[in-house]
Amino acid sequence: MKWALIVIGVLVGIAVIVVIIGAMLPKGHVATRAARFRETPEVIWQSITDFEKFPSWRAGVTSVERLPDRDGHVVWMERGGHDAIPYELMESVAPSGNSVGRVVTRIADPKLPFGGTWTLEIAATDGGTMLRITELGEVYNPVFRFMSRFVFGQTKTMEDYLEALGKKFGETVSIQE
């Protein structure tokens, strides 16, 4: 009985520490990752804007459902193993010649324990394309904030996205900060 109480006490203590540390962390964060691809900017652009085909190359996305537009913006629901997250396309400018393409998406559900935007910039390089993702994220729940910062990492989803895009084209990409 004594050991059970000690174990319970330690677990409660750890939980309290996680909540306290999470509460002390800032809600917002900025993270950036990039990768080079052999494909042209137009091919990369087509892949990252054709959200209905995400399940064919993004391992964590099992289905995509088009939702009604919101304030003139395209909205869709991405479903994965444990969740469904709606996204809103805030900005979409295709790359053209030497001009950089830009896509801005936003998590479109304020009830989730996290939110924010991704800005994807598509630029031509010698022999291919550079795709840079910048996340302006917010994590509202202190426990999730702790987990995001110290367990999962705030760049994991971006890195998975870039690696999956490379795999779609038969490339092994090198992730850059």
Go through each PLM region and give its residues.
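Beta-strand/loop substructures that line and gate deep hydrophobic ligand-binding cavities in soluble
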Residues: 88-91, 104-167, 171, 175-177
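Broad hydrophobic/π-residue packing in well-ordered secondary structure
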Residues: 45-47, 54-58, 74-78, 105, ...
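Short beta-edge strand/loop motif at the mouth of beta-sheet-based domains
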Residues: 52-102
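Intrinsic-disorder/low-complexity, polar/charged segments enriched in Ser/Thr/Lys/Arg/Asp/Glu/Gln
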Residues: 28-36, 84, 102, 117, ...
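Hydrophobic ligand-binding cavity/cleft-lining segments
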Residues: 4-68
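Short coil/turn motifs at beta-sheet boundaries
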Residues: 26-28, 80, 113, 126
